[in-house]
Each structure stands twice: as C-alpha cells, then as structure tokens.
Amino acid sequence: ALWKSLLKGAGQLVGGVVQHFMGSQGQPES
C-alpha cells in the first residue's frame, strides 16, 4: 500500500535525524 511506503520513508527520515542529533550531542562543534 502507498501509506506503508510513505510510513517507511518517514521512519527512515526520523531515524536519520535522531542519529544526526545524537552525533551532534556527542561532538559539539562550538
């Protein structure tokens, strides 16, 4: 179904954002 594809894409996007924030917190650039 189309909604399943959209949900999967949204899940991957959220996962990437979470990993990005976790990495940023681990190594602050400022």
Swiss-Prot record:
GO cellular component: extracellular region
GO terms under biological process: defense response to bacterium
Expression sites (tissue/organ): Expressed by the skin glands.
Subcellular location: Secreted
Alphabetized UniProt keyword annotations: Amphibian defense peptide, Antibiotic, Antimicrobial, Secreted
Organism domain of life: Eukaryota
Family assignment from sequence similarity: Belongs to the frog skin active peptide (FSAP) family. Dermaseptin subfamily.
Biological role stated in the UniProt entry: Has antimicrobial activity.
Protein name, entry field: Dermaseptin-J10
